[in-house]
Amino acid sequence: VAQDEDGKIYNNDLKDNNIEISNCITSSNGKTGNCIVLITPDAERTMNTYLGVSSETKFSEINFEQVSEANLLFMEAYVVTSPDTKDTAKKLIKSCHESNIKIALSLSDPGIVAGFKDELKSWMKMKIDYLFCNHEEAKTFCDANEFNDLRTYAKTIFITNGVNPTIVLEENQTYEVSAYKAKAVDTN
């Protein structure tokens, strides 16, 4: 985060929810990232994400001793868009594999998958534990509606599909989990 108003809000929210931030990397330059989410009346969404100073995170800035205390590392595929964070992500994945820390990755956005598919696949040469994506991201990643290829890259895959059931792929098994009906509420 940056030392700006958004950074203060994020840090305060994390503290309020008992999340340790003593090793949070804070930049005195630039802006904290943000995301604009637009929701349509049928509860679909589209996002416009700006990574801000997080796109400059270098592996040398990360306290891996603290990371190694975690059970799981969660990353968004958005980090593939910056040379610094792309390199950091590759090194984190390697270090987590070596330390037996589970790895979860969200494919983030169909445009990210389309533009950086080969890089994302290279990150998962050694299988990650959990892959999260929506139907469009999965189709883009596999170049088809057949998602079994995803098993090459992750042990457990969760594919959301709007109001349709979420598909869960594990080794040789496939499950469907129905979505709960909910009403979209505009909180602005």
Predicted regions and their residues:
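Hydrophobic beta-strand scaffold residues
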Residues: 21, 103-104, 157
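Short gly/ser/thr-rich secondary-structure transition/capping motifs
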Residues: 18, 52-59, 110-115, 141
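Substrate-binding N-lobe of the ribokinase-like
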Residues: 1-34, 41-42, 51, 64
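Conserved beta-alpha-beta core of the PfkB/ribokinase-like small-molecule kinase fold
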Residues: 72-148, 164-166
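Short amphipathic alpha-helix with an adjacent loop that forms part of the alpha/beta core around
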Residues: 59-68, 148-149
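Alpha-helix C-terminal capping/helix-to-coil transition sites in glycosyltransferase folds
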Residues: 68-69, 126-127, 153
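Conserved phosphate-binding/catalytic region of the ribokinase-like
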Residues: 94-95, 143-188
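Short beta-strand scaffold segments in enzyme catalytic cores
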Residues: 34-38, 46, 165-169
